[in-house]
Regions:
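Patatin-like phospholipase
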Residues: 1-38, 46-355
Length: 355
């Protein structure tokens, strides 16, 4: 298999999604000639370039807001760090310490990223950061980074506004995602046209461009980025969810599983389309999503329909309790959550009623 270029978007704790995707790509046999990343994507990129999968898992298992930055204890809850009511507390931290001390992050990275191993891997590495001193982006490749300063450059690509200076020189740096959070152009400009993009954020950056050329680009990303949760949520529950989402979405991107909102074996989904029709299958997936059927697993037809019918029965019971005097079928069509069209799920309802 020919090697790909790899583009890794930034997105804080959502970066574990990229690790799950990487596991799937390793199983498929995908290899990379170059990896470019922004923010957490640059950190994952260094681990991927050096093929340090076990170290990457350990780093993410160790990662937390507590170990990532040094900040007042009452701000360490990810929901509190940037909340409006805590801005005065955050500003006091910045004023008192000259910024938020990011040195714990460097200590954490030093445990798991081996610069020598990265340099000897034969895989090129690139990152983007934004210089507040020069007010311009900096695209940097591994060959441009002095020996012993890789971690400083990775941190310079990942700067939260107000973070203390720990960059490669006297410049002040900001997260490179403000310029381009999905740096496809960085590869295209350097002659790479065959690439995989693992996207984990709705933020694109000031200079991001949509690519409309003959490049071969495979995108791996969730159907709904919001399913990845908050960028500072390092909880164990979200770790597992993001990892598994990345794994399944990568397999889907390479055609090993199928489905739009859910994951099915290729033959399973073909059989469902042959039996119910493409429009009905689209409705079944959408209805399953609306009613809360678990998405992060690979379904066969029986398991999927059983899970959907169970949710459908719960929904019928709820409607029956709320609208006992109305005709049930009519009520279903009118009461489907966030439905834009009263007939949006008509085919799905008919299938479920018959089964």
């Amino acid at each position: 298999m020919d090697k790909y270029g790899l583009v890794l978007a930034g997105g804080g704790a959502k970066g574990i999604y990229q690790l799950g995707a990487w596991q799937a790509l390793r199983e498929i046999g995908v290899e990379f000639s170059i990896v470019v990343g922004v923010s957490v994507g640059s950190i994952n990129g260094a681990l991927i370039a050096s093929d340090s999968f076990s170290e990457a898992k350990q780093l993410w298992e160790e990662a937390s807001l507590d170990r990532g930055v040094s900040v007042a204890r009452d701000l360490r809850n990810p929901e509190k760090l940037f909340s409006l009511k805590n801005i005065p507390v955050l500003l006091r931290e910045v004023w008192k310490n000259g910024g938020i001390d990011a040195s714990p992050t460097k200590d954490l990275l030093a445990e798991f990223i081996d610069e020598k191993k990265v340099r000897e891997s034969g895989v090129d590495l690139g990152l983007i950061t934004f210089s507040l001193t020069e007010y311009e982006p900096k695209e940097v490749f591994l060959r441009d980074i002095p020996e012993g300063q890789l971690l400083d450059y990775l941190l310079a690509s990942s700067k939260v506004p107000g973070v203390s200076k720990i960059g490669p020189d006297d410049d002040k740096y900001l997260d490179g995602g403000v310029y381009d959070n999905t740096p496809v152009e960085m590869l295209l400009k350097n002659g790479y046209n065959r690439m995989i993009v693992i996207d984990i954020s709705n933020m694109k950056g000031l200079a991001h461009k949509s690519v409309f050329n003959n490049s071969q680009i495979i995108y791996i990303r969730p159907n709904d980025i919001d399913d990845l949760g908050a960028a500072f949520d390092f909880s164990e529950e979200m770790f597992e969810k993001r990892f598994n989402m990345g794994y399944l979405d990568a397999r889907k991107a390479f055609g090993l599983v199928s489905g739009r909102l859910f994951c099915f074996g290729k033959e399973v989904f073909r059989e469902m389309i042959a039996k119910y029709g493409a429009d009905a299958c689209e409705q079944l997936e959408a209805f399953a999503s609306e009613t809360g059927v678990e998405k992060i697993k690979i379904y066969n037809k029986t398991d999927f329909m059983d899970a959907l019918k169970a949710k459908y029965e719960e929904y019928k019971q709820q409607l029956a309790e709320e609208e006992k005097e109305q005709r049930f079928y009519s009520n279903i069509l009118k009461k489907i959550p966030v439905s834009k069209d009263s007939n949006e799920y008509e085919l799905a309802i008919e299938i479920l009623e018959k089964n």
